Amino acid sequence: MTLLTPDQLEAQLRQIGAERYHNRHPFHRKLHDGKLDKAQVQAWALNRYYYQARIPAKDATLLARLPTAELRREWRRRIEDHDGTEPGTGGVARWLMLTDGLGLDRDYVESLDGLLPATRFSVDAYVNFVRDQSILAAIASSLTELFSPTIISERVSGMLRHYDFVSEKTLAYFTPRLTQAPRDSDFALAYVREKARTPEQQKEVLGALEFKCSVLWTMLDALDYAYVEGHIPPGAFVP
């Protein structure tokens, strides 16, 4: 590929999101449009918990490699957003409020015993990607947050409208993300616009975002196959 201007690079990143972000997945359309039953929503929340719980570990692997205090301070905030600054705070704790509200046993959720194999493989692949790839690629892989405010708004409004078993309280995880995600993506986008200075680096950045979109899409493929089409693998959560 030829060298892109920063604006051209950003345009291609946004095009990847328009084509590949998981708000386009059929399972998410069903979730937002009220087409799932409570058991299927439970399965989604249970499996998504593993992703939420591993985000701080993913960010910690990158934090350890960042070369400046400025970058580390910025990335440390992401860990605090998810882990909280004291027990019972942060995004992971709020996600457990969602699984509690859906009637799932908290010990069972945290045990990870009911995960779909594809959930575990996909999330672990993402954590390993951030650990093993370049800092530039690792930061670029977080750019799905460019698109998350739209899906969060669709999800919250759709679920509140269609499901009587959720409330604003059980969906409290999503409210802070409406401000946290744009803040984080603004930083990551500015970083890749500045640091991706060669065609090879720009290709790496685009590939990282495509990879992350594939991780999220694959998780929904597995949920759809198991809990919509009815092919639950041995050992996974059975409603």
From Swiss-Prot:
Functional pathway: Cofactor biosynthesis; pyrroloquinoline quinone biosynthesis
Enzyme class: oxidoreductase
Pfam family, one: TENA_THI-4
Biological-process GO terms, alphabetical: pyrroloquinoline quinone biosynthetic process; sulfur compound metabolic process
EC number assigned by the record: 1.3.3.11
Entry GO MF terms: pyrroloquinoline-quinone synthase activity
Keyword Ribosomal protein: no
Family: Belongs to the PqqC family.
Role: Ring cyclization and eight-electron oxidation of 3a-(2-amino-2-carboxyethyl)-4,5-dioxo-4,5,6,7,8,9-hexahydroquinoline-7,9-dicarboxylic-acid to PQQ.
Name of the protein: Pyrroloquinoline-quinone synthase
